[in-house]
Swiss-Prot record:
A long alpha helix in the N-terminus mediates dimerization, while the earmuff domain is responsible for core histone and dsDNA binding. The C-terminal acidic domain mediates the inhibition of histone acetyltransferases and is required for the DNA replication stimulatory activity. Transmembrane segments: none annotated. InterPro entries: NAP-like_sf, NAP_family. GO terms for biological process: endothelial cell differentiation; nucleosome assembly; positive regulation of transcription by RNA polymerase II. GO terms for molecular function: chromatin binding; DNA binding; histone binding. Residues 1-42, 157-206, 235-289 are annotated as: Disordered. This is Protein SET. Residues 236-289 have a biased composition (Acidic residues).
Length: 289
C-alpha cells in the first residue's frame, strides 16, 4: 500500500466564536486590600487585556487564511474538472474507492455496494466564501434502485453559526428503498444477519439530525475528495490476508521438513554409535582370546 499522501485541502480552521470576557471586579479601588492580593488583581487585569489582543489577532488570521483558501480553491477547480474526466474512463472507480476507505466501507451493506456500482462521478463544491458551507453531488447512471440522476447533500452555516443540512429526496423504484431494508423471513439466522447488516449508506441523505457532526460528509470532503486515487489503489485486504495465510502455510511446511531432516540425522547418528560400540566389543573379545 502506498503511503497516504498529504491532503491538498487542509481542513478549514473553525473560527472561534468571540466570547465576552467576564467583568472583573475592581478590587484595586479597595484601600484595605493587602499588597499581595492587589498585585495579583492587577496581573489578572493585564492578562485579560493581553488575551483580548491575542483573540483579535486570531480573528484577523482566520480572515486572511480564508482569503488565501478562497484564492486557491478557485485555482484548483480546472484540475478537479480534468481529474473527473479521467476518472470517468475507469469503471467502478468510486465504488472501489468507497469500499477501500475504512470509515466509509463500514457504512456499506451489500445492496449499497450494488447501487454504488452505478455511481459515475462525485463532486465537492465549497460555497463562494467557503466558511458558509459546501455541497456533495453524486452522479448515477440509469439503475434499478432509484430514478434520480443526481443525489446531493448541502451543509450550511447560518449567520448565528448553527450548522444545518438539506438533501435531494431519493425517488426509489418500487420495492427498492434501501433505507427500509427488511426481510419477511423470521428464522433466527435471518434475524441475526439483519442485526449485523449496517444501516444503509443512503440513509445519510435523509439524516439531518446533527449537521455539525456529520462525519461522512467531512470524510468525503476533507479526506477522499482531495485525493481519491490513494484509496482506489489500496490493495484488496482479502487478497493480502490470503497471501499472508499462504506464506504462513509455506513456513510451516518448511519447518516440518527441517524437523524431519533433523530427526533423520539424529537416527543416523544413533546407528553410527551402535556400530562403533559393536566394533569395540569385537576388538575386546579378540584381545581376551
Amino acid at each position: 500500500m502506498a503511503p497516504k499522501r498529504q491532503s491538498a485541502i487542509l481542513p478549514q480552521p473553525k473560527k472561534p466564536r468571540p466570547v465576552a470576557a467576564p467583568k472583573l471586579e475592581d478590587k484595586s479601588a479597595s484601600p484595605g486590600l493587602p499588597k499581595g492580593e492587589k498585585e495579583q488583581q492587577e496581573a489578572i487585569e493585564h492578562i485579560d487585556e493581553v488575551q483580548n489582543e491575542i483573540d483579535r489577532l486570531n480573528e484577523q488570521a482566520s480572515e486572511e487564511i480564508l482569503k488565501v483558501e478562497q484564492k486557491y480553491n478557485k485555482l484548483r477547480q480546472p484540475f478537479f474538472q480534468k481529474r473527473s474526466e479521467l476518472i470517468a474512463k475507469i469503471p467502478n472507480f468510486w465504488v472501489t474507492t468507497f469500499v477501500n476507505h475504512p470509515q466509509v466501507s463500514a457504512l456499506l451493506g451489500e445492496e449499497d455496494e450494488e447501487a454504488l456500482h452505478y455511481l459515475t462521478r462525485v463532486e465537492v463544491t465549497e460555497f463562494e466564501d467557503i466558511k458558509s458551507g459546501y455541497r456533495i453531488d453524486f452522479y448515477f447512471d440509469e439503475n434499478p434502485y432509484f430514478e434520480n440522476k443526481v443525489l446531493s447533500k448541502e451543509f450550511h452555516l447560518n449567520e448565528s453559526g448553527d450548522p444545518s443540512s438539506k438533501s435531494t429526496e431519493i425517488k426509489w423504484k418500487s420495492g427498492k428503498d434501501l433505507t427500509k431494508r427488511s426481510s419477511q423471513t423470521q428464522n433466527k439466522a435471518s434475524r441475526k444477519r439483519q442485526h449485523e447488516e449496517p444501516e444503509s449508506f443512503f440513509t445519510w441523505f435523509t439524516d439531518h439530525s446533527d449537521a455539525g457532526a456529520d462525519e461522512l460528509g467531512e470524510v468525503i470532503k476533507d479526506d477522499i475528495w482531495p485525493n481519491p486515487l490513494q484509496y482506489y489503489l489500496v490493495p484488496d485486504m482479502d487478497d493480502e490476508e490470503g497471501e499472508a495465510e499462504d506464506d504462513d502455510d509455506d513456513d510451516e511446511e518448511e519447518e516440518g521438513l527441517e524437523d524431519i531432516d533433523e530427526e533423520g540425522d539424529e537416527d543416523e547418528g544413533e546407528e553410527d554409535d551402535d556400530e562403533d560400540e559393536g566394533e569395540e566389543g569385537e576388538e575386546d573379545e579378540g584381545e581376551d582370546d
